[in-house]
């Protein structure tokens, strides 16, 4: 959807909306609807196969309303979501990272140790030994509503989620990073209960390098 329609990635936003549905029949049903993925029996891996319905709904609202923030607000109202979901930026971004087998996740990779560069969220999420993650364009503006929400928050919680492709990107946008650093809110890093491809080489101590951003 992102490549074909030029929109910001809806996947993490869909997951957040589904998680904010309340524990009622309405909320549980809509959470399941948002997370439902089509399974095409005749021609798998084509068309809508494995596409989440929630992504289609979100992108439809974006096209109709012309505003990612407003589209997410309408989606939240439809679902009865408790809370507001905001994008980190309203500009489509590309994420890429360098792969360096055996690298220390708390240190920058020396250029001579980098074996390849992986571009795209879905591809990068399958890699281990990732370092030097970056966004393009690097100077993209943050969503103003997201900056305001951080400034007014009592708690800023990072995670759980895919470490390199869902959590760290928020610290790569300068406006969001600065808002987190100057916020009087308490900060909490929530680790995943199980490791995925991105964090196979990381122990819990590896996450403490986030303090370098303070």
Model-derived segments and their meaning:
Residues 183-187:
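A short helix->loop->beta-strand "cap" motif at the edges of active sites that frequently abuts
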Residues 164-172:
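Glycine/threonine-rich flexible loop motifs
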């Amino acid at each position: 959807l992102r490549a074909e329609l030029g929109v910001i990635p809806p996947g993490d936003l869909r997951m957040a909306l589904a998680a904010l549905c309340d524990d009622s029949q309405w909320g549980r049903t809509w959470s399941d609807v948002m997370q439902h993925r089509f399974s095409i029996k005749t021609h798998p891996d084509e068309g809508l196969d494995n596409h989440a319905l929630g992504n289609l709904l979100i992108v439809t609202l974006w096209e109709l309303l012309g505003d990612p923030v407003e589209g997410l607000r309408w989606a939240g109202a439809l679902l009865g979501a408790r809370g507001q979901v905001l994008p980190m930026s309203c500009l489509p971004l590309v994420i890429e990272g360098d792969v360096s087998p055996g690298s220390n996740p708390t240190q920058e990779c020396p250029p001579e140790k980098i074996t390849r560069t992986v571009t795209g969220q879905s591809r990068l999420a399958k890699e281990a030994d990732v370092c030097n993650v970056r966004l393009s364009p690097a100077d993209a503006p943050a969503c103003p509503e997201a900056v305001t929400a951080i400034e007014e928050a009592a708690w800023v919680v990072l995670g759980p989620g895919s470490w390199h492709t869902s959590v760290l990107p928020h610290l790569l946008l300068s406006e969001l990073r600065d808002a987190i650093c100057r916020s009087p809110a308490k900060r909490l890093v929530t680790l995943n209960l199980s490791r995925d491809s991105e964090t196979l080489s990381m122990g819990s101590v590896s996450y403490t390098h986030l303090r370098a951003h303070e």
